[in-house]
C-alpha cells in the first residue's frame, strides 16, 4: 500500500508473511521488465529502470533475478514481455478514496479480480475521473529522522526541486515533481542522508480521517486488493489518527 498518512506505519509493523514477500518480489520484477522494455537495459540512460532496480535491491530481490528481468524486458532473451497499465478508482468507507494501479498481461482478468475484491470488501467502483482528481502525481522520498530536523532535510533537497518536506512522526517525506526524483535522491546522497523509499506516487490533495470501525473496513479492503497479482500499488487519501492506529495494533 502506498499512502501518505500515518496509518501506513501500522501495516509496516505487521509480520511479513512469505507469501506477501513472494508477491512483492514478483511485482518489483514486473516493474523492472516494463522499464527495460520501454527504455532499454542501460541503467545510466534509463531513469525509470534505475529507480525500479534500486527499489528491488532495497527489498532484497536477488541480483540474478534483477539481471534476468532486465534482459527479459529488453528482449535480450527472446521472451515477449507485454504488460498494460490500468488504473481503477474506488470509493471506500467513510468517504475515503482509492486509486488502484495495475500492471497486467490480461486486462479482463485484472478487471474481474479488482472489481470482485472491491465489492466483497465494502468498496464501490467509481467512474473514471471521479476519484483521480483528488490526487496528483509526485515524486516521493521517505526517510527516517535519525536526529535530523525538517530544516536539515529541506536545505539538502531544496535546490534539487523538492516542493515540501512533511513530518510523519517517525519519518520525513519529501515531495517533488516526478521528473526531479532522481535529483532529490542524488542531493540526499551528497548530503550523507539515508532514505528508505523513493518512487513516483499519487498523493492526495486532502486526507480523510477514519474512525476505528471505518479503519478496520478500509484495511480489509486494501489487504484484499494488495493480494492480487496484477495490483502494483494502492493509493488512498485515508488518514488514521494515533488513537485509531493504537487501537488497530492492540487487536
From Swiss-Prot:
Give an example GO cellular component term for this record.
Answer: cytosol
Keywords associated with the record = Cytoplasm, DNA-binding, Transcription, Transcription regulation
The record's section on Pfam families has: TACO1_YebC_N, Transcrip_reg
InterPro entries given for it?
Answer: Integrase-like_N (IPR017856), TACO1_YebC-like_2nd/3rd_dom (IPR048300), TACO1_YebC_N (IPR049083), Transcrip_reg_TACO1-like (IPR002876), Transcrip_reg_TACO1-like_dom3 (IPR026564), YebC-like (IPR029072)
Question: Which GO MF terms are attached to this record?
Answer: DNA binding
Name where it mostly resides.
Answer: cytoplasm
* UniProt-listed Gene3D superfamilies: 1.10.10.200, 3.30.70.980
The protein's superkingdom reads: Bacteria
- SUPFAM superfamilies with a match to the protein in the record: YebC-like (SSF75625)
The family classification in the record reads: Belongs to the TACO1 family.
Could you identify this protein by its name? Probable transcriptional regulatory protein Arth_2304
Question: What is the species of this protein?
Answer: Arthrobacter sp. (strain FB24)
Amino acid at each position: 500500500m502506498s499512502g501518505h498518512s500515518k496509518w501506513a506505519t501500522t501495516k509496516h509493523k505487521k509480520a511479513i508473511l512469505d507469501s506477501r514477500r513472494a508477491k512483492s518480489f514478483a511485482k518489483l520484477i514486473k516493474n523492472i521488465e516494463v522499464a527495460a522494455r520501454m527504455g532499454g537495459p542501460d541503467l545510466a540512460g534509463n531513469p525509470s529502470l534505475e529507480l525500479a532496480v534500486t527499489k528491488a535491491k532495497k527489498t532484497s530481490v536477488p541480483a540474478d533475478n534483477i539481471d534476468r528481468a532486465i534482459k527479459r524486458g529488453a528482449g535480450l532473451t527472446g521472451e515477449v514481455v507485454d504488460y498494460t497499465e490500468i488504473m481503477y478508482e474506488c470509493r471506500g468507507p467513510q468517504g475515503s478514496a482509492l486509486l488502484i494501479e495495475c500492471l497486467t498481461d490480461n486486462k479482463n482478468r485484472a478487471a474481474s479480480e479488482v472489481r470482485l475484491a472491491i465489492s466483497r470488501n465494502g468498496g464501490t467502483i467509481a467512474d473514471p475521473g471521479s476519484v483521480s482528481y483528488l490526487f496528483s502525481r509526485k515524486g516521493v522520498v521517505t526517510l527516517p529522522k535519525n536526529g535530523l530536523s525538517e530544516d536539515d532535510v529541506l536545505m539538502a533537497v531544496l535546490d534539487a526541486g523538492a516542493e515540501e518536506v512533511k513530518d510523519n512522526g517517525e519519518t520525513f517525506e519529501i515531495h517533488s515533481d516526478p521528473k526531479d526524483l532522481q535529483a532529490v535522491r542524488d542531493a540526499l546522497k551528497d548530503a550523507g542522508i539515508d532514505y528508505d523509499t523513493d518512487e513516483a506516487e499519487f498523493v492526495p490533495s486532502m486526507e480523510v480521517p477514519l474512525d476505528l470501525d471505518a479503519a478496520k473496513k478500509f484495511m480489509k479492503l486494501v489487504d484484499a486488493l494488495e493480494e492480487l497479482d496484477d495490483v502494483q500499488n494502492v493509493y488512498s487519501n485515508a488518514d488514521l489518527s494515533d488513537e485509531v492506529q493504537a487501537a488497530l495494533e492492540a487487536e
